A protein has these predicted regions:
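Class I SAM-dependent methyltransferase SAM/SAH-binding core
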Residues: 1-30
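Conserved Class I S-adenosyl-L-methionine
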Residues: 122-169
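A short SAM/SAH-binding and catalytic strip from SAM-dependent methyltransferases
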Residues: 39-54
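A generic alpha-to-beta junction signature in SAM-dependent methyltransferases
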Residues: 15, 50, 64-65
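Short, glycine-/aromatic-enriched active-site segment of Class I SAM-dependent methyltransferases
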Residues: 76-99
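A short acidic, Gly/Pro-enriched loop at the edge of an enzyme's catalytic core
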Residues: 29-41
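Short alpha-helix
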Residues: 99-116
Length: 169
């Protein structure tokens, strides 16, 4: 969703230089970088689209991270997977196929445990869940506007944001 130049401006406002952080918008399955290019990789609100393949970390992401480097992931999720009985509140904004990109912590633990090239530092529900959703819903893009229907109907009680932190071996 994000323009790298908008992110660059934000990072500069936060006191980070272009040498410290590089905003990227690219196909995560074919990154245009040398192996071991990054000290850390941060994925915000996107890993759930491409990272559901248990081989993705080892095959597609970790090669670009220096040994000892960190992966920080923040993704929307579910407090408890309810795909077999989707609440009507969630269906106000998302189709069942779209909701298949949101899962609970146990699901992500099962995906991440297949990774051989990194150790898990933590997988947990973010404490800022309500703040993160509120920030998202304030955005004036078509996706955030559409998501408001479910959240206004109480869909937030089923959703969270999940943090995953890994260190490359």
């Amino acid at each position: 969703w994000s323009d790298p130049e908008d992110n660059r401006k934000f990072f500069r406002k936060m006191g980070l230089s272009d040498e410290q952080i590089i905003p990227v918008k690219a196909d995560a399955t074919a990154l245009p970088f040398e192996e071991e290019f990054f000290d850390a990789i941060i994925s915000t609100d996107s890993y759930n689209y491409f990272g559901r393949d248990p081989k993705f970390l080892d095959d597609k992401l970790l090669p670009y991270l220096k040994h000892g480097g960190y992966v920080y992931i923040a993704i929307p999720g579910m407090k408890k997977d309810c795909h077999s009985n989707l609440p009507p509140e969630l269906l106000l904004s998302w189709t069942p196929d779209q909701l298949d990109y949101m899962h609970d912590i146990m699901y992500w633990e099962n995906i991440i445990r297949h990774c051989k090239g990194a150790r898990v530092i933590s997988i947990h529900e973010m404490e800022s869940n309500e703040e993160v959703w509120n920030d998202w819903l304030k955005q004036e893009n078509e996706y955030a506007i559409s998501d408001r229907k479910a959240m206004e109907a109480g869909g937030g009680k089923y959703l969270n944001f999940i943090s995953i932190v890994l260190q490359r071996l």
